[in-house]
Design a protein with these regions (language model features):
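Substrate-recognition/cap regions that form aromatic- and gly/pro-loop-enriched pockets
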Residues: 332-419
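Midchain, well-structured core segments that form catalytic/ion-binding scaffolds
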Residues: 93-98, 102, 137-139, 144-356
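His/Asp/Glu-rich mid-to-C-terminal helical/loop segments that flank catalytic regions of hydrolases
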Residues: 215-232, 261-263, 306-316, 324-327, ...
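Acidic, glycine-rich active-site loops and adjacent beta-strand->loop/helix elements
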Residues: 73-75, 132-140, 161-165, 203, ...
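Active-site metal-coordination/substrate-binding segment of hydrolases
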Residues: 61-155, 191-194, 308, 316-319, ...
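Acidic/His- and Gly-rich active-site-bordering loop/insert found
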Residues: 2-96
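Active-site-adjacent substrate-binding region
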Residues: 217-219, 224-240, 392-435
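Zn-dependent metallopeptidase/amidohydrolase metal-coordination segment
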Residues: 327-350, 354, 410-468
Length: 477
């Protein structure tokens, strides 16, 4: 008897008790190794904590071609007081699974749970199988980018990291993640009135999937506020914290600043002006975003004026959002940029930018342009991750078989589309010659945000499509 999705949900619940932000995947990597040991399956763990678990073919299918199930173990943690210790409290409402006040981790925890349920099952028909789970997919892809050539044997890959239930993802934009650091010196704070301006209520979202939805970036809104304030009075800044993750549209920000004693009215005027600007530009697409100013405690140190001016100049010049729509793929963003995080650190102001494009040359050119903007203000830029774009042949036998399984199981064919977010597939194509990849998954809405949710019925459907696809692939070479 084919197992139901009940076990998938049980595994997902177990995963969500393990905090797994990017760069801190040791515990979930341990979980995967223990999972393999419990099933007496061979596994390998590399220095990046990536894990591949190998399962022999079902009896009678030993000569079939090896099949790979691909997922990542990290998640974007939003709304958590401490991402390294806070578990996720999931609940079901109106046919959707959601989380209370945090991101859910369905990206990519549901796909990983499916893969582990397949490993556990003795009823599912499949050939030799490898389940590979990578690290740091959400913030640099260092796991996939550093895989050794002997880590994987299979050349047909089912990636379970898609978020569009009615599609087979057959391509993904390339991406370049850059960190920029503006040198800063701190000096004793002057006398004056202290305030904290906070931006909150924004929808945020995935900086690839949601970049074309016209949402307000809390970084750009903060820049507007600071620019408007400096046109009316002098001020000093003690601390900056904008954005939640490099791969998310910033939905919140906080700046602590000081103004002269007679400038309280100016601060109130700038607050009103900023909220007016937000309403006029984002009132429909992001109605909850707002700016609020409140008095705060006196701070001891402030950033030097030149560094603050350099930051504002850079944030003004660096583009945010869609730069170009594709001329060959309908309703598809070709090139975009997102300013993910801005914060004061020891000796610098840190800024992250995430550039995406289906054209590698355009991505490289835009990344260089952004680095040049920061360089002109004395900043140093570092490319943390550069992933190539990926495009499969939509007429390949593997993709057609995947499409056939949707038709036979669900009664309809999915669309084959290229998506404006980076997938690890680009690195797999580079590392493993001859590899073919199809990416499928349940419907996940607003990933990388506290509104993240997954539709339960689509998990059921994708589970049965996956089982049928594995069965049909389990034929002798």
């Amino acid at each position: 008897m084919i197992p139901t999705t009940e076990r998938v949900f049980q595994i997902f619940k177990e995963l969500n008790q393990i905090p797994r932000p990017s760069h801190h995947e040791e515990r979930v990597s341990d979980y995967l190794c223990n999972f393999a040991e419990r099933l007496n399956l061979s596994y390998k763990r590399d220095k990046e904590n990536c894990v591949v678990i190998r399962k022999p073919a079902a009896p009678g299918y030993e000569k079939a071609e090896p099949i790979v199930l691909l997922n990542h173990m990290d998640m974007v943690c939003v709304g958590m007081s401490n991402p390294q210790t806070t578990p996720i409290e999931a609940y079901v409402e109106d046919g959707w699974m959601k989380a209370r006040g945090t991101s859910l981790g369905a990206d990519n925890g549901i796909g990983l749970s499916m893969a582990l349920a397949v490993l556990e099952s003795k009823e599912i028909v499949h050939g030799p199988m490898e389940v590979i789970t990578t690290t740091n997919e959400e913030d640099g892809m260092s796991g996939a980018s550093q895989l050794g050539p002997d880590f994987l044997k299979g050349r047909k890959v089912i990636n379970l990291d898609s978020e569009d239930y009615d599609t087979i993802t057959t391509g993904a934009a390339g991406a370049c993640l850059q960190f920029h650091r503006i040198p800063v010196e701190f000096k004793p704070a002057p006398e004056g009135l202290w305030f904290c301006v906070r931006f909150a209520g924004g929808l945020g979202g995935h900086s690839g999937v949601d970049i074309n939805k016209g949402r307000c970036s809390a970084v750009k809104a903060s820049c507007y506020f600071l620019n408007a304030l400096r046109r009316k009075c002098s001020f000093d800044v003690a601390s900056i914290r904008m954005g939640e993750a490099n791969a998310s549209i910033a939905s919140s920000a906080e700046v602590v600043f000081c103004v002269p004693a007679d400038a309280s009215g100016i601060v109130e005027d700038v607050e009103r002006l900023t909220n007016k600007w937000i309403r006029e530009n984002f009132g429909v697409a992001d109605p909850g975003m707002c700016c609020g100013v409140s008095p705060c405690e006196v701070q001891e140190m402030v950033a030097n004026a030149d560094s603050l001016a350099a930051l504002i100049s850079c944030l003004e010049q660096v583009p945010q959002g869609v730069l170009k729509m594709s001329e060959t793929m309908a309703d598809t963003v070709e090139t975009s940029n997102n300013i993910g995080r801005v914060m004061t650190e020891d000796g610098c102001i840190f800024v992250s930018t995430h550039t995406r494009s289906f054209i590698d040359q355009d991505m490289d050119a835009l990344s260089r342009r952004i680095a040049d903007i920061f360089a002109s203000c004395g900043a140093k830029s570092e490319t943390v991750m550069s992933a190539p774009a990926w495009q499969e042949d939509q007429h390949s036998a593997f993709l057609q078989l995947t499409s056939d399984c949707f038709l036979d199981v669900l009664g309809w064919r999915p669309r084959m589309v290229a998506m404006h977010f980076v997938l690890e597939a680009g690195f797999f194509v580079e590392h493993f010659p001859g590899i073919q990849i199809a990416s499928i998954g349940p419907r996940i809405v607003e990933p990388h945000s506290t509104s993240e949710r997954v539709e339960l019925s689509t998990i059921e459907d994708i589970w049965h499509v996956l089982i049928e696809l594995l069965r049909r692939l389990a034929v002798p070479e």
